[in-house]
């Protein structure tokens, strides 16, 4: 039986940026090989730094998918733990927990051949390149494409034992925004001979907030945030360029597209009024809203509601983004939050999950997967 805490701590020490998860993939493959050897019903494929593990069913009618992400973040860890992430990278979003749970589930589910097919996806590049979309568009699944897809994300403000989801939208769709205003530089004493890009950018920052307050239905939800602005070189030189980096988030794709449209119109209008050029890049890619399939979500919620170890929470949507939304736009499925009881939030340099979540997750979620792939009646358990 694999040691979940040891695996999680080893994975935690080797975080890698999306599509560069070479050491992570090597480590995962070694454990996967150990778990699946001498089991002819299991096959393994790789796609770039991703891994697909397929358990062929004995009487297959469909394929159930379980997805985990494997990449880390460019953050320096400040927990002072002996197994802290290294080299200016950190598993600050809990993907080390996600991977460890997936390996534990694979161990449980590979003990005997399931009736239906079961696919484990170890997906790269969730944080930066929408790896799920990349794999889907590259046809990496081939004939292993699931009929239903499931996945989880850790949540620090929930307790170990909490499983939280809903029957509609769980996560927002996100769109990255990069915008540059291009004017004419000059001496601060002669502003009339220059064209100040910083002033135009500041004007845009204030005007762009009217999209949410005046263009989006008050009963809908959207966020437009610019967290980065770069302009100028010193105090007495008028800035020739001003660069803005921000994000759009919404709970529906319709609102996201409306917000993108209005942002583009505002940027062009302000550029025209200041007689400037702009460079605008809107990057949404695979970060669509995470839309749970109502029927499948109801089934999952009813299952965990009856699970004595779990505390099922019907939770409101969150403005966090997840590229699992793209896969769920192609394949019906469900994502849920998993409580890890950390004082520090996701993407924090001090995020430190309670490792008791590992055994709880594997024991509880494996029962759900058994229920799905072996077509058990509700409440029926398998003996592992």
UniProtKB/Swiss-Prot annotation:
Catalytic activities: N-acetyl-(2S,6S)-2,6-diaminopimelate + H2O = (2S,6S)-2,6-diaminopimelate + acetate
CDD domains recorded: M20_Acy1_YkuR-like
Enzyme Commission (EC) number: 3.5.1.47
Keyword Amino-acid biosynthesis: yes
Pathway where it operates: Amino-acid biosynthesis; L-lysine biosynthesis via DAP pathway; LL-2,6-diaminopimelate from (S)-tetrahydrodipicolinate (acetylase route): step 3/3
List of catalytic residues: 69, 127
UniProt GO BP: diaminopimelate biosynthetic process; lysine biosynthetic process via diaminopimelate
GO molecular function: N-acetyldiaminopimelate deacetylase activity
Alphabetical keyword list: Amino-acid biosynthesis, Diaminopimelate biosynthesis, Hydrolase, Lysine biosynthesis
Top-level taxon: Bacteria
Pfam families xrefs: M20_dimer (PF07687), Peptidase_M20 (PF01546)
Function of the protein: Catalyzes the conversion of N-acetyl-diaminopimelate to diaminopimelate and acetate.
Protein family according to the UniProt entry: Belongs to the peptidase M20A family. N-acetyldiaminopimelate deacetylase subfamily.
Name this polypeptide is given: N-acetyldiaminopimelate deacetylase
Organism the protein comes from: Lactococcus lactis subsp. lactis (strain IL1403)
